[in-house]
């Protein structure tokens, strides 16, 4: 529906000499519905609480989704990547305990996505700790779950889940990340190896007890040595049984430039795909599922959340503008905005491009077993450098 409105809007200004392209839009925001008693003020307040900012502006204020002046990513570019219907969902507490039953079939769980033979799964995380205030809007911690499926000498990326946290202590963020790592059957974790990222890496480097699930997750460590800082982060972990699964992204002007260009290339080439917008997903997918139809309000909000995050990431990306005064690409968010969702997405894509895909394009045949030795320790996949 939104694409139809946008096209009609364009036709209003481009159809003067072509009557077949005539178009007209009449828009009325929520105030008119209140004035005529179609909706009450209380109903509008409730509707706003249930919407993300982007949906509220589009559906109730009739504001078109626009971008920043000098934007690096256009609406159409990112909107064309929103093609995935099915989202991944982490296990609820009830689902987790059900999964321990002898006759449990995980393929029947809503939100389960089977892992393909050549598939690699990545969790990419941009970390923040401070809470936003009325005077300053801080970034959220954002985690993206990305599937990378091999096709010839490239990987097709599918971002199937996102979640965000604000003002959460690092020790709790380590728990959330490890829990999601095993729920998603992930292979790698990508995160910023500076500032708060260092504290998080230190927390991940020790076993983590999950009181809700009554289980302990193993230690995890940084494996990459492409910068001295990354190597130092790997050396901080003293647990000999730690899983070597963390890629520490050490930002620099050059590395950020590569990250931005990699992200744009993945979108332009169609390699990067993400979830449909929330409005489309509800119409085309969720409203046809019994899990959504018979869910209460809280559960419906949980099921819609990944699609809302897809919209929020789009809105964030089209609000980024390029600093034209610098030779290397630098992206700036507006004064009232953030870019945590974009950074989480772009770091994950950077890892796939510069770590996974480069192995495929080498002349020699790349074999993961040549780089890592895998065994089972305590029921978990154990990976370490040799």
Regions found by a protein language model. Give the residues of each.
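RNase H-like, metal-dependent nuclease domains and their acidic two-metal-ion catalytic environment used
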Residues: 38-224, 257, 261, 274-386
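Short mixed-charge
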Residues: 7-18, 210-242
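Hydrophobic transmembrane alpha-helix bundles
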Residues: 31-38, 97, 226-231
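Conserved P-loop NTPase catalytic core
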Residues: 1-83, 241-260, 265-269
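GHKL/Bergerat-fold ATPase module in large chromosome/replication-associated machines
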Residues: 233-237, 252, 271-278, 306
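Extended oligomerization regions of viral-like shell subunits
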Residues: 232-238, 268, 283-287
């Amino acid at each position: 529906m939104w694409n139809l409105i946008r096209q009609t809007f364009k036709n209003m200004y481009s159809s003067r000499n072509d009557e077949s392209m005539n178009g007209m839009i009449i828009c009325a925001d929520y105030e008119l519905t209140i004035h005529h008693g179609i909706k009450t003020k209380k109903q509008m307040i409730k509707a706003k609480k249930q919407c993300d900012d982007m949906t509220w502006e589009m559906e109730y204020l009739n504001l078109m989704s626009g971008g920043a002046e000098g934007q690096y990513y256009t609406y159409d570019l990112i909107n064309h990547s929103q093609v995935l219907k099915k989202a991944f969902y982490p296990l609820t507490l009830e689902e987790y305990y059900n999964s321990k039953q002898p006759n449990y079939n995980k393929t029947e769980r809503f939100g389960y996505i089977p892992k393909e033979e050549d598939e690699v799964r990545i969790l990419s995380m941009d970390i923040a700790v401070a809470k936003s205030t009325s005077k300053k809007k801080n970034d959220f911690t954002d985690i993206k779950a990305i599937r990378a499926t091999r096709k010839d000498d490239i990987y097709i990326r599918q971002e199937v889940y996102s979640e965000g946290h604000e003002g959460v202590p690092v020790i709790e963020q380590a728990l959330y990340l490890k829990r999601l790592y095993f729920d998603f059957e992930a292979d790698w974790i990508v995160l910023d190896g500076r500032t708060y990222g260092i504290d998080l890496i230190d927390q991940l480097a020790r076993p983590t007890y999950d009181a809700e699930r009554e289980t302990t997750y193993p230690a995890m460590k940084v494996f990459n040595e492409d910068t001295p800082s990354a190597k130092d982060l790997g050396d901080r972990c003293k647990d000999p049984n730690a899983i070597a699964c963390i890629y520490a992204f050490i930002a620099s002007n050059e590395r950020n430039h590569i990250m931005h260009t990699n992200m744009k290339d993945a979108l332009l080439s169609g390699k990067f795909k993400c979830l449909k917008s929330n409005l489309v997903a509800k119409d085309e997918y969720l409203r046809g599922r019994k899990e959504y139809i018979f869910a209460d309000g809280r559960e419906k909000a949980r099921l819609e959340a990944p699609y809302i995050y897809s919209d929020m990431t789009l809105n964030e990306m089209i609000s980024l503008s390029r600093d034209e005064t610098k030779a290397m690409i630098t992206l700036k968010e507006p004064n009232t905005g953030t870019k945590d969702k974009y950074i989480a997405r772009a770091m994950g894509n950077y890892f796939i491009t510069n770590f996974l895909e480069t192995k495929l394009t080498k002349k020699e045949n790349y074999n993961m077993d040549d780089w890592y030795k895998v065994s089972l320790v305590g029921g978990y996949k154990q990976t370490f450098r040799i």
